Curated annotation (Swiss-Prot):
Belongs to the RNA polymerase beta' chain family. RpoC1 subfamily. Coiled coil: none annotated. Mg(2+) binds at D511, D513, D515. GO terms for molecular function: DNA binding; DNA-directed RNA polymerase activity; magnesium ion binding; zinc ion binding. This is DNA-directed RNA polymerase subunit beta'. GO terms for biological process: DNA-templated transcription. DNA-dependent RNA polymerase catalyzes the transcription of DNA into RNA using the four ribonucleoside triphosphates as substrates. Binds 1 Mg(2+) ion per subunit. Binds 1 Zn(2+) ion per subunit. Its EC number is 2.7.7.6. It is found in: Plastid, Chloroplast. InterPro entries: DNA-dir_RpoC_beta_prime, RNA_pol_asu, RNA_pol_N, RNA_pol_Rpb1_1, RNA_pol_Rpb1_3, RNA_pol_Rpb1_3_sf, RNA_pol_Rpb1_clamp_domain, RNApol_RpoC1. Keywords: Chloroplast, DNA-directed RNA polymerase, Magnesium, Metal-binding, Nucleotidyltransferase, Plastid, Transcription, Transferase, Zinc. It catalyses: RNA(n) + a ribonucleoside 5'-triphosphate = RNA(n+1) + diphosphate.
Amino acid sequence: MIDKYQEPKHHQLRIGLVSPQQIMAWANKTLPTGEIVGEVKNYRTFSYDRDSETYKPERDGLFCERIFGPIKSGVCACGESRKIGDEKEKRTFCEKCGVEFVDSRIRRYQMGYIKLASPMAHVWYLKRIPSYIANLLDEKIKDLENLVYRDFIFAGPLTKKPTLLRLRGSFPESKTKFSGSRDILSQFLKTKSFQKLRDREFSAGAGAIRKRLANLDLEVIIYSSLAEWKKRKEQKAEIEIKPTRTERTEEEDRKIEKIKRRMRVLVRRMELAKHFLETNVKPEWMILRLLPVLPPELRPIFKISEVQFISSDLNTLYKEVISNNKILSDSLLGCKFVPEQLLTGQEKIVQVAVDQLLDNRISGQPRRDRNKQLYKSFSDILAGKEGRFRQTLLGRRVDYSGRSVIVVGPSLALHQCGLPREIALELFQTFIIRSLIRQRLASSVKTAKKQIREQERIVWDILEEVVQEHPVLLNRAPTLHRLGIQAFQPILTKERAIYLHPLVCKGFNADFDGDQMAVHLPLSLEAQAEAYLLMFSTQNLLSPGNGDPICVPTQDMLTGLYTLTLGNRRGICATRYNLWNRRNSQNERIDDKHYGSTKGKELLFCNPDDAIGAYRQKRINLDSPFWLKVTWGQHRIVSKELPVEVHYESLGTHHEIYGHCKIVRSVKTERHFIYIRTTVGHLFLDREIEDALKDFRARVV
């Protein structure tokens, strides 16, 4: 349970780039002796201790207790135990082994790091589409991959520093006299002077990319990309100035497509540079200098027999990185000269090992086990339906939640959902108990629970009151975007299914063929305010991806509207303007016998209720045309349509006949009548629109 009187430790979860200093801050610990631990230097996991006849973690290894914490709470690697104190108390360490006396649960979140001998590219930002590194540097992905894997090199600009021709003074005097240029070159390639020249004038690998990323000016990138985008837009307009597509040649069409692709690249580059500026993230962090090591509990190892262990695939991939990185580090720091080809090959091996650890599927050389199965990399553990986010974090059962099948609720408002009473009774149980005790309807919590269990009438009344002021959250897995979870006002139903308005189905990507949805209850006032202001379905009418309307009528709705408004399209001319085919000005009762004899003739009704009553008595069909008399104050004809014919009578009355209506005007009485040719379906639709407008006006007022 979260203590509401204590400031929560974590407010949000964000995935992104971090600096090397932050990675070190996560892992480093300072021992009382002044030694800093946190770097994983040994690729071994456990070793057999003959004294205790048990397996213990290797020092500075992947399961080191000094780095990640003790395996048993309060027990160090030496076997000494001490009482675990509060987090606010001073940290205590073992004087012999340097293990901190803390709870063993620290091994679930304490991290380590691997110090890479040379910078390595992060495969997520290099090989994934779109490639962020390629977008920022405005280079091709293939060229950058060749550079990372040492197939290409960057040649630096000319400087005023010594070059090859002026480095003769770097040799000892006794070795400057050689008979031939080949001997001079071979001797020079083995000196440190050549290494300095190579590092200054040429660069390869991820280190070269890191230098270019560090020298980028993001504001200049934004302005230059915008200027080029405007220039490309003008070029595109010059080609498209021709009125018809047939006048353009195939070459011009190819130029237009090429310009469009370039404009899309420029837009992505500007957005990426703007994102780096807003988040205060440096682009060179996409090149790794320190590789984080996950806590041991997230990559466990199990003992199944005396000599057999089962380990996570991550441990195998970490071992490969550490062992190859150690070889590279020894080669770079060694006193002996190492040929450039060996260094290049070893750096490429380390880069491949890092790629396999981060994402084994998109790495150039995926690593497999004995059964030819791919090792599960860091990306495989996070992504997918069985990944850590969807299965362990998002897929876990939580309190104050329920689940049921969804069915269509066309009578609901857009912000409402039908919630089964059984689910609501369980979700709002604590609120009902509090209300029963406050109103002195129950003397204790036990008595209130008994009343809820027996489902007394007062319980349902209180539930109705509580539900009116409390929103609920509906979620359908998988939650691919923010519209996958929305807030609704619950309406209690006696059924066991959740009723959902059909217009919100597109946001959830749901249909009514047996889909299930989860119900969550926001508890705090902040969560309820967020649900009302941001998460209500009426606040999410547009798609967050492209801004298009997401609450659009479905095919069922369009078919229903078509059927509802389907009628005789022949118009008034089909009856030769004869409004009185059926002499029924007084709206007399039409029995079945008479109605059968008037087949093909159109009836007249003085008000909509009589027409709807005749439909319910099956006197007319849903699409049967009839004449409806309305007063001038209720409807006004606003149209530029000219009358088909005008009839003038001797008593001063004249009839203006239009396509689907007839207006009767009287000069003496100044009375106006309108006869509309319509159907019952149109009446139903008109009433629904009027009710919706009345409800909208009431809420606005």
